[in-house]
Amino acid sequence: QNISAETIKAALTPNTKAIIVVHLAGMPAEMDDIMALAKEHNLWVIEDCAQAHGAKYKGKSVGSIGHVGAWSFCQDKIMTTGGEGGMVTTNDKELWSKMWSYKDHGKSYDAVYNR
């Protein structure tokens, strides 16, 4: 059974900053309710899509609904790199820019490609 807005709401504290939603066994969680709850409480939503490659929620690909999608390509996952690996996705340019810099010791995209 997937996480739900109801189970999340019961666990929220004043220290909660984000919700990590795991789409289990290719079955997306009820994202409309979760996103509404996150908006109400000003929380980030991170989708763990490691078990849901290609899955859709109401026509939208998982990993594109929350603020960030996280994809593990570890050797025991659906899609692998033959070892350790992964990917993050976002529709937010500011988040993308920050995440991009993490992969290269803090260098910005502009510093690498627009000098």
Language-model features, listed with the residues they occupy:
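Substrate-binding/gating loop at the entrance of the active-site cleft, primarily
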Residues: Q1-E6, D76
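Catalytic PLP-binding core of fold-type I/II PLP enzymes
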Residues: A5-I20, A25-G59, D92
